[in-house]
Amino acid sequence: MKSPARCVRVALAAALLAGLALSSAACAKEEPPPVSVLGPWTGDEEESFEKVLALFESEYDIKVDYEGTISRRETLLAQVQADSPPDIAILPSLGELAEYAHEGELVPLPEAVRERSPAPWSPELAVDDRTHTYWTPVKIDLKSVVWHYPQRPATKGDWCLGMGSDATSGWPGSDWIEDILLQQAGPGVYEDWATGALSWQHEDVRTAWETWGRIVTAGGRSQAREALANDFEAEDGRGLLKPPPAAGCTREHQGSFIRRLYGSKVRFAATADAVPELANDNRAFEVSGDMAAMFRDSPEARKLLTFLTGKAARTAWVAGVKERNRPFFPVSAGTYGEAWGNRSVDRALRGATRLCVDASDAMPPNLVEAFHRAVLEYLDYLGSPKGRKSPLDSLLEQLELERGRQHKSGAPYVPSVCGTP
């Protein structure tokens, strides 16, 4: 028979062990879950971004789960509808982010991040009578430029042009029309149009479409047909602009991201300098960006956003990629090596008088889809035999009706898209 004292000792030991087990379990639960990030980068770009995230994990002892996808809109929408959004999502569409903000899905940026979020990429939004900034550019790109190989003289009308881009086919054409409007009518008209205040049937908008039509068909109507058949990166994924001595088109209107396909031998000029029809002294450029927004608030997510917009992350990102893949930021990283294109893009970004976010990136998604469809229909007309009636009046009317539907439904527009460097 066990003594009462021994029973008490056994009971105390068991209680102590149970307490230690509970304490250990509680400590184990204190480890935060990984910060989930949904972004646009896959392949080599994903590997480069993962290196930046690895530095964050090492510095802060916080794990990050990154998911890269080219179907970012569909993936993010499905996750939000399933009530399981990522902690942070990175995407180029201000229009989509504005919708999420007005639906109450986004968390306002922390103060430290907001201070690093300049115009035109991060406008303030009024949501429920309170004004906040909801997204910040992680990296940016320059548009309003034309690329060429110096060894090959430009041939009139010989433009590299491809509309194919899966679910977003048509955007290279919308980029052209946006840039033409910016160069012809100036930042004020451009901003009114991009923010929903200017009719699609306005004379300046119509003129931009007609100018693009003349540019596309200057080398013959077959160029429009080829544009409909081509992917924007070409069938081989190496770009439409081929180096000498290969034959083919001689100029390409495209954003600075296209450097990754062409390397250091390709050169660019501002659209206003490269396209005689668009000559002006505005020094205004279209830009785009990959914006980070917080869908679920946590100290860890805030730390990651702060890190991604800071100098250490940007320096590591630049150092960890090939010259042709080097990213650009709202504030110059100052380390662009010897590549002519990298230094020149950075100088253009800092030397512009006005920078205006890609208009279709700022518009409501339904209107953007209609814009892309209209581009493809207009190209189909441009590539058809002469004698067919232009559909432009009808296309602009349809786009104006869609603008009206967006206003009637209360779809949010961003309040501004232009700013100074």
Segments (PLM) and residue ranges:
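Secretory targeting and sorting signals
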Residues: 2-29
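Early extracytoplasmic/lumenal segment of secretory-pathway proteins
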Residues: 32-103, 119-121, 385
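Short helix-initiation/N-cap motifs at beta->coil->alpha
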Residues: 68-76, 225-242
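Extracytoplasmic/periplasmic substrate-recognition and gating elements
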Residues: 263-327
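Hinge/lid segment of periplasmic solute-binding proteins
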Residues: 94-144
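Glycine-centered hinge/linker elements that transmit conformational signals in sensory
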Residues: 194-233
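Conserved C-terminal helix/tail region of periplasmic/extracytoplasmic solute-binding proteins
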Residues: 347-421
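Extracytoplasmic/periplasmic solute-binding protein
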Residues: 136-138, 155-206
